[in-house]
Every structure is written in C-alpha cells, then in structure tokens.
C-alpha cells in the first residue's frame, strides 16, 4: 500500500490550483450507483446491497479457490490412476497365477522326468551290462584258452628242457665214467702183472741172498742156541698178488643200469596235461553255456513314480504378495488422499485471509483513488484486479532508473503473472506433482517385486528338491540292482576263475611232486641227486613258483564292479541352472523375455505401464512449464528491447503518451491539489521550477508566485509529482511542449523548456517520459536557470 500511495501522490503533483478553475460538470454531490455510500472516502457498509461481491460473499467461495480446486484435480487424477493400477494389479495377479500354474505344470513334468527317463536309462543300462558281460565272458573264454595253452607250453618247455639237460648231463657223464672204469681196470690188470713179476724176481733174489747170509752166520751160536735161522719164502704172496684181476664190467654195471634207467618224463607230462586241462575245459564249458543264454533283465531296475507338485495350489505366497501389494497401495492412497485433502482444506485458510486482506485493500484503494481523482483507468483496473502482482511490480520498478524502465519492469511482472500464463504454470506444476505421487506408488510396487522373485526362487527349489528326491530314490534302487549283478558275476563267473587258478596251482604242485618223485627214484642215493635237484629247482621250481604267484594275483583281483549311478543323475542340470544368472539356462525362465520368469514379469508389466504413463504425463506437464517459461522469456526479450531501444517521437510515427491534464474532458477528475495551496493565496498562478532531465532543463508549473522554499505537505516532506512532456490539452487548444527562451513563464499551460533544441531532445529522448521532482522555490522573484529541485526520474 505504501508503494500505491506513493504512486498516487506522484499523480497528484501534476495538479495545482488551476484545477479549481476547471471544475468538473458535477459537484461533490454527484450521482452514485445503487447501494453506494454517500461518503466518498469510505467503503460501502455491509448492510447495503451492492452489485459486486462483499466480504461475506467472497468468504463463502473460499472453498472453491484455485489451490483447493487444483488439489482436488490432483486427487481425482490419483484416484483414476490408482483405479487403473488396481485393475492392472488384478490382471497381473491373474497372469501370475496362470504363470504359476504353468510353472507348476512344468515343475511337475520336470519332477516326473525320472519316471520317463528311467525307462530309457534302465534299458540302456541293461543293454550295457548285457554287452559288457557277454564281452567279458568272450574275453574270459579266450583268456582261459590262452592261459591253458601258455601253462601247458611252459610246462612242456620246462619238462622238455629239463629232460634234455638231464639226458645230456647224466648220459654223457655215465658214458665217461664207464669208459674210464674200463680203462682203469685194464690198466690196473696190466700194471699188477708187471708189478708182481718184477716183485717175484726181486724177492727171489732177495730171499736167496738173505737165506745164504743167514746160513753163513750162526745166529744161534751167537745167542747160545743151536737153532738154525728161518728161511724167507714170499712166492705164495706174490702169486696171490699176481692172481688179482680187475673186471670193468662189474665196476660199471650200476652206471650202465643207471644210464639205461634215465626217465623221459612222458608220464609226468601226460599226467600234468590231463590235470591242467580239466579245470580249464570245465570253466570254458560253463562260460560258453552262460554266454549263449545271458541277457540282463531291465525290469529289475526301479521306475520312479510320477510327481505332481502343488507349490502353487498349497502355497498362498503369490496370493499373499498381491494382497499385501494392494494393501500397501491402499495405505499409500489413503495417506496421499488424507494429505491432499488436508492441504486442500488448509488452502482455504490463507485464501480466506487473502480475501479479507484483499477486501480491505480494495476498500483502501477505492478511497484513495476517489480522494485523488486518479484518471488512469487501465492502471486502476489492473491494480484492483491483480493487487499482489501489481504491488510486486511497483516494488520492483523502484530498482530501475527512468520512467520507461520502471513502466517496462511493471509490464514484465504483469506479463509473467497474467492469468493465462499462471494457468499454464499451475497446470504444469500440478501435473508434475501428480507424476511425483504416481512415482512414489511406482517405487512402492518395485520395492515389493524382490519378495515375489524370492518366492519364485523357492518354487524352483521345490522343483529341484522333488527332482533330486526322485533321482536319489531311482539311483539307490538302480545301484542295488547293479551291486547284485556284480555279486552274481563275481560269484558265478569269476568264481570259476578262482577255482581254475586254485586247480592250476594244485596241478603245478602235483607236477612238482611228480618230478621230484621221478628224480628221487632215478637219482636217489647217487652223487648226482643234489646237482640234479639244484638244476630242477633252478629250471622248473622257480618258474612254477612264478606261475603260481601270478595265478594267485589273478585269483585275488578277478572280480567285476560296474559303475553306479550318481544320486543327482536327473537333477544335476536343474540344480546347476539355478546358480546360473543367464535366462537361457534357467529351466523356469522364458527365453523370449529378458525378465527372470513369467511370474515376476506379470508384476513388472504393471510397473512398466505405470512408468510409461508417468513419463507421458511428466513430458506433458514439463511441456506446459516450458511453455510458461517461453512466455516469460518472450516478455523478457520485449522488456530488454524496450529498455535498450529509443522511442519514436510523434513526428517519427510514434504515439504520444496519454496526458494527465484532461482539461478538455470535464467528466474526468483531475489530480487537483485540494487543501495545500502554494503562494500568497489559494488562487495564485503556477510557479516555475527548474528540473534536470535529458541533459537539459524542463520547467513545470507548481504553486504560485512567492512560494516559500520546501513548502510543507501536511507537515511532511514534499511529495514527488509527475508531469507529462507531451502536448498539453487546455481550453485554448493543444500545445506541444512550450519553449520560453528566458524570464518567467507566466502561463498555466504545462511544462516548458528554454529553447527548441531542448524540446526536440526531450521529444526524441522518450515520448512517454514523465518527469518528477519535489517542490521548487523562487529566489528574489525569479527562478534560477539550473539546480532547482531534484533530478527527475522515470516512473
């Protein structure tokens, strides 16, 4: 109001006492509208009927103020959006349950896979076991034949080798021994004859000489005896020695007998062959019989039962999820509605206060306008219709210098806050606020999706668990069948091998015993027994021991063990798919979509649909806000151009400004100075004041001659008034800005300048300019040429 009062006071300064010389056609007792109060300075009383709305009528409509209506529109939009979301959630629930049923069917089919796969796996396993056993028996048959021949070959080789060695060694030795004995016998016989002949002749000569010697000496006479000495006669002993003859045939008779009795081991070899071949032939016979009739029966394998999963039917997780989601949305809806309704109700309070304040402000403005006879009808209407923006424009205009800039600043505020512009802005902001509320709802939905995804993950776990249980049960039964097959083969097939190896070892022992017995019979008690037994142990004993050791190893390791089925043979792939993040590997995923599965996708679709609606509405609302800022920018460009450009004068095609001095229009109230009369009396002429403007001075009539310096205005500092420099309309016609070269201008017809150049400068500078100044004064009966008053400013 202070700005408005200052503005009116500036208009009032354009009038002086001359106004009293041009009274209006009507007096102070002018005709009023119906219901008008006779006091022109007071607002109509409340007990009068008026064609305009009073305070109570205005207050009765505060509940339909723009902000409440805007919030109600937002509430309606949210209700429409939430109803759409509820329908989408219901559709998503139906789709999710349908998808869950599909997943349940898929899960049941997956869990029943062991039932379908086991038949083929059982047949394949049975065929594999059959072929493996037949192949093993064929190999066993060939192996037995090979081992049999190898054992016989080794035994034959050893016996033949040993026989050849014995024959070579013993026969050769015996032949040498017999020949040597015969040669020794012949040599001894010949030697004895020669020795005995030589001994006989030698002993004969010795006997003769000894007897002749003894006869010549008288031994008896020496010892006193008459006995004659004995005579030595060795011929009989020599004859006996000469009669000794060695017979070689008697000496090598035993060797010849031994040579004739050397064994050929044919009996041992034949006995060994018959003993060794017997178990081999028996085993081969059994293997051949089993091989022809063996076929593994696949019916002994278990077949799992079909599985029917009911994790959707028995589990209310999806139902609970959507019920909880609807409850969450309802809570959010209630909170938003309560907040918006409270805001809409509370908006009535400041709007009621605004109506009260506006009503009082309008009363004050009406009184001021009526008291000061303000004549700018459009400005009056604008300030009355838009009190807030007009007052803000007045305050903003004070920051600018010059009348034109101040007017343009006020125009910019009026342009930016016009009803159409604010309507566009309000629609845009309301739309953005609605998008914000819907965005909160969208985030609420997205926040609940992980819970549903977790439930879907549990569904997959149920499927894998059922599949794993079926797989484990089938693997347990199948492995039991395989273990029984292993036991049967090891006992019925490789039992023969164990029997055969034991029999072969026993046969080899018998072979060794028979060989030893034959050698004992042949060489027992002879000097060749130990060498022969050493050679036998070296050539045969060690080899037989090695064969027995190998056969023992074969007996210890001759068993079959078919591989067993793993417990996760049917569930391994499904379990692995749960740990893989790619959609193509997840057996519950739909490869055609990028979402994890159809169940969560049903909820995601709701969020995407709402997100698309929010984006569309946000773009529309943002476009409205942008349109508003475009309007503001257009006004700003217009103001900048107006401030920077030069106004055209009337001579250049421009239009002159409206004047405040409408003396030619008697029905207009002029801004007359009513109580403050300057000069010596109330009817003195106008006094002249120098003013600074446009580099030159301008004079305007203020008061009368003899006006004192700084005359008071109701005891307050002198207000500033406004005067037009456009042509002045008076009773004598219309004049342009007057030119007074010097001296006093005894005229009451508007402002004037010193020379023509000054007038042109003023008109060229700004045709719409209005100069303001405080009261001037006279010095020594004449005005000063410069420096009077304050420099003018533009308003």
UniProtKB/Swiss-Prot annotation:
Residues 752-762 have a biased composition (Basic and acidic residues). GO terms for cellular component: mating projection tip; plasma membrane. InterPro entries: PRM1 (IPR026777). Coiled coil: none annotated. Keywords: Cell membrane, Conjugation, Glycoprotein, Membrane, Transmembrane, Transmembrane helix. The chain crosses the membrane at residues 67-87, 150-170, 331-351, 422-442, 617-637. It is a multi-pass membrane protein. Glycans are attached at residues 189, 259, 270, 288, 469, 483, 498, 505, 520, 580. Residues 13-24 have a biased composition (Polar residues). Residues 88-149, 352-421, 638-795 are cytoplasmic. It is found in: Cell membrane. Its main location: membrane. It comes from the Eukaryota. One of its GO terms (biological process) is plasma membrane fusion involved in cytogamy. Residues 1-66, 171-330, 443-616 are extracellular. Residues 11-37, 736-795 are annotated as: Disordered. Belongs to the PRM1 family. Involved in cell fusion during mating by stabilizing the plasma membrane fusion event. This is Plasma membrane fusion protein prm1. It comes from Sclerotinia sclerotiorum (strain ATCC 18683 / 1980 / Ss-1).
